[in-house]
Amino acid sequence: MAYSGFQFGAFNPQMGDGRAMLLGEVEKDGRLWDLHAKGTGLTPFSRLGSDGRGTLSSMLREYLISEAMHALGVPTTRALAVISTGRPIQRGHVQPAGIVVRVAASHIRVGTFHLAAQTDYTRQLADYAIARHYPGADYQEFFTQVMDAQIRTVSHWMRLGFIHGVMNTDNTTISGETIDY
């Protein structure tokens, strides 16, 4: 899912998702879950000069930290698999490329709304997000519930002494799940 937003104090209209794709939704026990692959290669949202891939080590880090956070009771995306692509990737030095497949209640980020605002799709996105995550809420209640979910998540981080290294609008989900390690 594409998104834009504020990063390092400035607005960036094209932040991502230039290396990931939403594979679809699955239902389990009456809930929808997003299946998402990261490090898949170029997408229509890739930035100029990007190859859309990720290192195997960064995908393994995402897997390990997300599973540790889950075990510690922190709302988070979950990693289903890490796949070595068998291809080399240049990131400082040549190393193996990888893909992480993850699952979450949502991959809709605050930055997804920043992008929607540029294209007049904010109401459609909000209506979808409310129906999916906060049924029956009006827009004000939706905003309040998203804030509450994010506050609960950050309080879990504080309890553990965890600091998200790049905490901005692209790494903040409306479901309150920790994303992108």
PLM feature spans:
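Acidic/polar, glycine-anchored loop/turn motif associated with catalytic or activation segments
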Residues: 28, 145-146
